[in-house]
A protein has these predicted regions:
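Short pre-active-site segment immediately N-terminal to redox-active cysteine/selenocysteine motifs
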Residues: 40, 65-67, 71-75, 139
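Conserved segment of the thioredoxin-like fold in thiol-based oxidoreductases
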Residues: 91, 96-128
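Short, Lys/Arg-enriched, disordered terminal segments
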Residues: 1-7, 28-31, 58-60, 91-92, ...
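Conserved redox-active cysteine motifs that mediate thiol-disulfide chemistry
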Residues: 71-88
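Thiol/disulfide oxidoreductase modules built on the thioredoxin-like
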Residues: 114-119, 126-172
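A short beta-strand-turn-helix
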Residues: 45-67
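N-terminal targeting signals for export/organelle localization
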Residues: 1-47
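Hydrophobic beta-strand anchors of alpha/beta hydrolase catalytic cores
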Residues: 68-69, 97, 143
Length: 172
């Protein structure tokens, strides 16, 4: 009789502990994405990819126009998939595309851009991922449409044909 009670008691204790932790994770806001829409763009200092000069967000986003901030990496397959759509958006006169190269090797990133072309007017280097975190990004690719220094749209994942048309409609 005692032998059967010990395993049953162990299972009950395990289930209680599991439910306690599960309930705690459900109530946690650690994994809740930040709502970045209609918020001001983050203020930051960053290195320019091509020149290694340091600049600030205030200098980059000085004009009251549309900016498309694209967080990308050469090792990111979806980034390669969305690249042709970014190249098409590059032709829009009222849009400036800013690239943030995320946790990448400079040589591989340059090869990526030489191979596919660069849609970016400026590329920023984010070696440790802190700039992406400031923007509220969790990975690559993520893209933010900015107007008047405010984030007006956040795109998680690669830009596709539907999103391309949506962006064009917004900026017209």
């Amino acid at each position: 009789m005692k032998i059967r009670i010990v395993p049953l008691f162990s299972i009950i204790i395990f289930l209680i502990i599991f439910l306690f932790f599960y309930k705690g994770l459900q109530n946690s806001n650690i994994y809740v994405p930040k709502n970045t829409i209609k918020k001001d763009i983050p203020s930051f200092k960053v290195e320019i990819f091509e020149t290694s000069e340091v600049t600030t967000s205030e200098v980059i986003f000085k004009d009251n126009k549309f900016y498309l901030v694209n967080i990308w990496s050469s090792w990111c397959i979806p980034c390669r998939d969305e690249h042709s759509f970014l190249m098409e958006l590059k032709t829009q006169k009222n849009l400036k595309i800013v690239g943030i190269n995320y946790k990448d090797n400079n040589k591989k990133a340059k090869t990526f851009l030489n191979e596919l072309g660069s849609p970016y007017e400026i590329i920023l280097t984010d070696k440790d991922g802190t700039i992406a975190i400031e923007w509220g990004a969790y990975g690559v690719p993520e893209t933010f449409l900015v107007f008047n220094k405010k984030i007006i749209k956040k795109i998680i994942g690669p830009i596709n044909q539907n999103l391309l048309l949506e962006i064009k409609k917004i900026i017209e």
